[in-house]
Design a protein with these regions (language model features):
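C-terminal structural segment of proteins
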Residues: 1-306, 314-329
Length: 329
């Protein structure tokens, strides 16, 4: 959508240039900003020109820049001990966006928009990520993502503050994780998204999103009993009501998912299955690349020494001779 009131787009290259005049907003990927009218918006400040590295992997934290795109996030390399790594693809695919959106939409934008179905909020809250916020006075503050989002399109960011990055503890990535999601239609907006995390020290955390107006975290020192978990879910009072799901339905499926994840955490740990992941081609890739990859026939493999060769394919049957009357013989 054209934002006809915008008069200027500024492209800062340093933090000193990152200032907001009245009527200006920060611009990341713009996938939400350009999706509807923005009354009173007179200028944009493009954060992507600041040159922040999308991903930085350290010993204790993985730093995700606010301008990191969804596509870049899904390319975060897994490590052998990162049992929770499949959550990245699972949550990213919950957005059900086209590859065009994946290549421009940013992690910071998804969190700052603060919609209940913001799947990257689900991911970061579930992994106990901390948001690093730049303040107008040149300082910064930190706040857990689970507390940054306070409601439907509301958060703790104040005028002039900018999301700089998210710090994901590698300890969370080493935790055993679970994931459940439901929508009213196969390709619908998330009605409820529940993740679990069992830390090496035994702490069990259930994070409920999409079905609630803000992330709801249920923490236990160890995997709780069924009644304790059900009681904790019942005490949640922020169930969301919109055309994508009624509050009582969201409460019911979230409780069901939480119990499934609790039971799953008590089972012996298995190697994590490959995360359901839909490859998103780059900006210049073909929109049909996914379909082509799924339907491609693998090349035949030559038999090894001593192996019996596969029998040749039968020759095609000869075409029927034409019938003089115009039919087939």
């Amino acid at each position: 959508m054209d934002l006809i009131t915008v008069r200027e787009v500024r492209t800062p290259s340093t933090r000193a240039e990152l200032r907001f005049a009245p009527g200006e907003l920060p611009l990341g990927g713009g996938t939400w900003l350009f999706s509807e009218p923005q009354p009173g918006l007179t200028g944009l400040v493009d954060l992507t020109t600041l040159g922040w590295r999308p991903l930085e992997v350290g010993d204790d934290v993985v730093t995700v820049a606010a301008t990191c795109t969804i596509a870049e996030l899904t390319r975060l390399p897994a490590r052998d001990d990162w049992a929770a790594h499949p959550l990245v693809a699972q949550c990213a695919n919950s957005l059900l966006a086209s590859f065009k959106v994946w290549n421009v939409a940013t992690v910071g934008g998804n969190v700052a928009t603060s919609l209940p179905a913001g799947a990257l909020t689900s991911l970061l809250a579930g992994l106990d990520a901390t948001a690093v916020v730049w303040t107008p006075d040149g300082g910064e503050r930190r706040e857990p993502v689970a507390r940054l989002v306070t409601g439907v399109r509301t958060n703790t960011l104040t005028t002039g503050e900018v999301l700089r990055s998210f710090e994901v503890p590698t300890a969370s990535l080493r935790s055993r994780a679970g994931f459940r999601r439901v929508a009213l239609s196969p390709l619908g907006r998330s009605g409820a998204l529940v993740t679990s995390r069992l830390s090496p020290d035994g702490e069990f955390v259930v994070t409920i999103t999409a079905g609630t107006t803000r992330p709801e975290q249920l923490r236990f020192d160890e995997v709780p009993g069924a009644a304790a978990l059900a009681g904790a879910v019942a005490r949640v009072g922020t169930w969301y009501d919109d055309p994508h799901g009624a509050p009582d339905w969201r409460r019911h499926v979230s409780a069901l998912f939480a119990e499934e994840l609790r039971t799953e955490a008590l089972l012996p740990q298995q190697p994590p299955p490959a995360a359901p992941f839909v490859h998103r081609p780059g900006p210049l890739g073909s929109a049909t690349a996914d379909a082509a990859a799924r339907t491609a026939v693998p090349a035949p493999v030559a038999p090894g020494p001593g192996a019996a060769a596969a029998p040749p394919a039968p020759a095609p049957a000869p075409a029927p001779a034409p019938d003089p009357e115009g039919g087939a013989a």
